[in-house]
Amino acid sequence: PGPSSPPRRRARAAWWVGGAVLAVVAVVVVALVVGLSGGGGTPAVEDPPVAAGPPGTEFPPGTVRIVDEEAGISYPFLGNGWFEYDLGLMPETRTVAGQYFTTQEGVPTGGDFIAQCTSGPVADGYGWAGPGSEQATVTALADSVRAAYYPFPNERQVLRDEALTVDGAAAHLVEFQLTWDVEGYESTGERAALVVIDVGRPDPALVYVSIPNTHAELYGVIDRVVADIAVL
């Protein structure tokens, strides 16, 4: 695919226009409830602040985790400046839950460029054949997102390609760095990570984190999210 391919996570997922039925994603958000007595708990780890961008749908005050009931997992809410993902479906998953913020408005191919941390049950067509196929599935998904959501041409450097255990479940992680030099984009690269988890359901869960290098100070959220995924 060349520069005319669909823009990076375009608002409202324009490729689904034309009769596709959007799934209604029920995202259950866990709120931190402060007790009436002795409210001094251990403070949450704070990530670097996110530069102000166009506002999206804010999470309820006190949110600490995002619970994706459809995928069967939960993971950390990354804090102020991250908004509820409401930009439409992605073809890699049956439904989408998660968080994002805009890093550049009006990229050359249309739509906006974003940082995101999203999840969902993996859709058909990505090689899932049950337990033991985590690596094949996440590899196919990594190729899919590279082709669909980033400027071309680009170069990919694989940083990690390894089996994991996530909350007792078999999983596989692929993390990579993309670089490009494409006119009209403020970023010249991106760090992305995908984790496929066998959650004991017909479809495995996908967690997808992607941060443009204009916000490289946030690369650490990848390790934070991967280390704190829970299986429901």
Positions of the model-derived regions?
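Solvent-exposed, non-transmembrane segments of extracytoplasmic/periplasmic domains
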Residues: 54-232
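Hydrophobic single-pass membrane-targeting/anchoring helices
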Residues: 1-55
